[in-house]
Structures are given as C-alpha cells and as structure tokens.
Amino acid sequence: MNIFDELKARGLVFQTTDEAALSKALTEDMVSYYVGYDPTADSLHLGNLVLILTMKRLQMAGHKPYALVGGATGLIGDPSFKDSERSLQTKDTVTKWSGKIRSQLERFLDFENGENKAEMTNNYNWFENLTFIDFLRDVGKHFTVNYMISKDSVKSRMESGISYTEFAYQIMQGYDFYELNQLHNVTLQLGGSDQWGNMTAGTELLRRKANKQGHVITIPLITDSTGKKFGKSEGNAIWLDADKTSPYEMYQFWLNVDDADAVKMLKIFTFLSLEEIAEIEEQFEAARHERLAQKVLAREVVSLVHGKEAYEQAVKTSEILFGGGDLRQLDAKSILTGLKAAPQHQIAPDEDLTLIELLISVGIAPSKRQAREDITNGAIYINGERVQELDYVLTDSDKIENRLTVIRRGKKKNFVLTY
C-alpha cells in the first residue's frame, strides 16, 4: 500500500485537488510538502497533532516536510469559518509563540537526518520587505474579487462583516505556497478541511504566476460519534505542552474515549499498522469492558507526545489515585492534577484537630456520631492508608510536601486538605 492509499485507509484524506496526479507523485518522487502553523497560542493542541502526525507519516515514507510558521499571517488572523474577527497579537507575542511551535514540532519530525530532513521557515521572511504596492501588483492582480468571495470560508462571514485585513488572508496564504515552491520546490500543502479555500488560492496563484501544478490534501475535521469536534475535555483544549495539559490529564482523556470512537482514533493518532489495529479491534469487540483500544490509545499517544517515562508515571498516578495505593508515592502536583475535581479545603498548618473534628469541619461527616462510625467501620483513609483510631491527629508525615493531605471516605469520595 502506498502512502496516499494508507492516508485514505486511516481516514486522513477529505479533499484533494488531483488525486491521480498526487498519488503518482507520492509513489514515484520525493515530494516536498508543507503545513502552516499560525502562532495563535503558546502551544499546539490535539487538533494540530493530526496534521503533525500526517507530516510524520509522509516523512517516514521518504517525502520532505516544511513547517511554515505564520509569523506574518499570525499578525493578521485567519477568518475561515470564525464567527468574529480574531484579536490581533503583538509582534513580540507572535515571535515568542513561533519559537514554541518549533520546539514542539521537533518531538515528532526529524530535523537532522537525511535528504528529506524537516525544515522550518517563517512567512515573515518574505512579507517583511514586500511593499503594499508590490503585493497588489505581483499577487493581488491574480485574484478576482468574485473568486475570493466565492470561498465558503468568506461567504460565512459576509453578513456579519469581514474586514479587508481578514479578507486578504487567503491571498497571503496563497502567496506562501508560491514562495515555498520558488524557494524549495514545494508542490503539496496539507491542512484542515476548513482551509480548502485558502489552500486552493495557493494552487491558483502557482498556476497563474508560475505555470505550475500544486497539490492540496485536506484532513477531515475529527469528530466523535455524536458529531462533536474531537479533542476537548470538558470544553477545554488538550494541549501538547505538559504545563497546560499534564501527561496524566492526556492519559485520562484517551482512556475515556467513547467505545464508538476508539478504533477510529487508533488509525488517526497512532503509528500502529492497520493490521495491528485490526487485531486490536477484534479483541476489543470481544470484550469491550476491558477497554483495550482506549488503553492502547493512551499508551501510544502519551508516549509519542510526552515520552514513555511520562506515560508510565501517568499509569502509576492513575493506579494509586483510583486503586487505593499510598499517595505518598506521588508528588503534590500529580495529586492535585488527578483530583482537581475533588473538593478542596484549606486549613492552617498548625491547626491541631482530631480526625473526628476534621471530618466534621470540612464537611466529610455531618456529625460526630457519623464520623465515629465511618472511622470504626474502616471507611476513612488518609493518603490512601486506612485509619481506624478515633483519637487520631494529623502529623507532619501526613502532609505531602507540606502542601496537602488527601482524605478519602469509602472507595471514591476524595477530599483534599491544603495548607
């Protein structure tokens, strides 16, 4: 199976400009291709990861990736299917975010070895000294207004209003393709399905200005079985930066993927062969309650994004938090991340309360009688260890890193005391 057929088999091809010509080129030649990343935040996220992994698949097949940071377009903002205009960022912010994109991409793409080693460039390099007059004469004249407003990405904003700044974005992105072709013989652009209009502006400019054929592959919007955009947890993006989304949180996200989506996501987000995924699917369907597909997803993606050690730590954290282990084996940060949904109560470090008084003061038990019953019946745990002494008083050894203590009532009801 050639790389183009594999991308299709994995559900990674939504639209292409000329499928036959593209498939032939990817089979016979080393194709130089690019993906643009506008620095709109200080980290890439799960939505970006689909494209990053697609870039990696093509590089592994012998093709040459160019990662284009939108140092110029990031100052403008892409209007595609946005309800309102993006807020403009400062040059300093865009420059800082651009640097972070590079460091994150280096985890996945090979920037060091071989003829097809990855390269990174910035479209600010060619826009910085391009005058407005030159832009209109050399680029703008190749686009009619009719052509530009026919794009679905622009149509969706016509009634609510779109500034000329954002309206011109598609021409800027089109010019990126032209420049990359002239500088590096780039002939293929990858992007999300919402980018089709901007991307074909590039193939149009390449045809008109250089009499060359450019190719486009758009990746489908990744949705779950209900049609919702995939990649968020409780409305929050899953970031690739460990400081924004911890490896543990990412691990839990994949572990909780719906059964109906698990095999599909294995094809999209892992480098397991399609044959291996078929075997996993067979075992998964035979015993869904064991959640094999989700466990493999969590292992593969967390290891890929954060490394094997971070994955193993996430597993350990999960087992200790929910399997009744000794919480003192974990650091305070891991505990707070894993139990962020649990009620937190702040108490003075020198507060000298018996366990019974503590259970009442933080609302774990409604009365002394109930507190005594819970302790006597073995329902109260401190940092995962059962405590049955009615006169027990917390000591410094119960304070993990002098920051917190976890009290659990029963199997799942956790309370976090902070100092």
Curated annotation (Swiss-Prot):
Functional note: Catalyzes the attachment of tyrosine to tRNA(Tyr) in a two-step reaction: tyrosine is first activated by ATP to form Tyr-AMP and then transferred to the acceptor end of tRNA(Tyr).
Protein name: Tyrosine--tRNA ligase
UniProt cross-references to InterPro entries, sorted A to Z: aa-tRNA-synth_I_CS, aa-tRNA-synth_Ic, Rossmann-like_a/b/a_fold, S4_RNA-bd, S4_RNA-bd_sf, SYY-like_C, Tyr-tRNA-ligase, Tyr-tRNA-ligase_bac-type
Family (UniProt): Belongs to the class-I aminoacyl-tRNA synthetase family. TyrS type 1 subfamily.
Root EC class: ligase
Listed PROSITE patterns: AA_TRNA_LIGASE_I (PS00178), S4 (PS50889)
Assembly with partners or alone: Homodimer.
Positions occupied by motif 'HIGH' region: 39-48
